[in-house]
Structure formats: C-alpha cells, structure tokens
Amino acid sequence: MKIIKSIFVCLLLLCGLNGCESGTEINENSGQQIYNDIKGTYVGYIVVDNIPQKTKITITNDFSVSPLPLKPILARIFTNEADLAEALESVKSITLTTPITEMSIIDGFVYLFMKDIEWEANITVNGKMHKILATMEPLTQWNMSTNALTINIVVTDLICNSESYDVKVNKISYFVDSATRE
C-alpha cells in the first residue's frame, strides 16, 4: 500500500512539474471532452481497521467524497476506547467537498488537483466540548483506458482545542483504489 501511495505522489509531483493547468486544457475541445468523461459518481472502498467501507466519489466542477469514516481522525485525539466510541456516535462520517482547480493529462492518466479541505466539528465527549479542525489534501488520478478513479486523502493538520496532533510522521491517509462509475 505504501508503494502505491509513493508512486501516486511521485506521479502527481511529476505532473505538477510539467505545469499543465485546467485553464488551458479544459477550454480546448479535447480537454473539455475528457473532463466531461470524468464527471459522474464513482463507488469505491476505504479500508478502516482492515474493514472495507463503501464510499461514493462525485466529480462535477467539485470533488466530493461521502461518507468519509472519521475513526482514523478521532482515534488520534480520543485514545480511550469509551471516549472514542462516544465521539464516533456523535459524528459517524462526513462528506468532503472541494472545487477542482486544475487538470493534467499524462500518459493515459488524468490528474485532478483541488484545494485543501478544512473540516471543522464540535464534538462533546464526557460533557466536554472538543473543537476539532482537520486539514486534508485530496489527490486524484483517473485512468483513461479503464475509467477507474484512484484517490488518496491525506490529513495534513489536526488540531483539537488548540492542541496540534502529529500527522506528519504518523500519517492519517484515506486511500481508494479503482473506484468505478456507478
């Protein structure tokens, strides 16, 4: 899994170095047609605690994923099982949405670039309010020959009640391999 993620990130970096922007490609007829081909709803699985959980990814002018299981994020904050269970009861999952800002086409793959997503929630555990802020970076790749979508959402910052949690070394990452059109 780590190898796939590393390759995915390297390809995205390579794409960024080539400097393709949606403003130029999407306005061209072929680029617009490819972008239209990508639009739609896809179904894939995010693995949490070795259990695949079904998720939907929607691509329009925005990128949206729902539901996004919160256990990996909340488990970093609430290390006591009872507290974690209470936190998960109040917010089981979320929908993330962000605008698509760029598109690049390289060797049969389309890379969609989006703004980072900021998720904020107030969760009460044991009668105490916890203000949580998580910043996530979505990375998306669409295979032009198979029409399969691969996404990786990496939590880049995690804060609860002004306390920062380590997500740089001990990463929180959501990975969906080969989501298919619904």
Residue ranges and their predicted role:
Residues 9-12, 159-161:
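Enrichment for repetitive, rod-forming helical segments
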Residues 29-182:
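First exposed extracellular module after export/assembly in secreted or surface-exposed proteins
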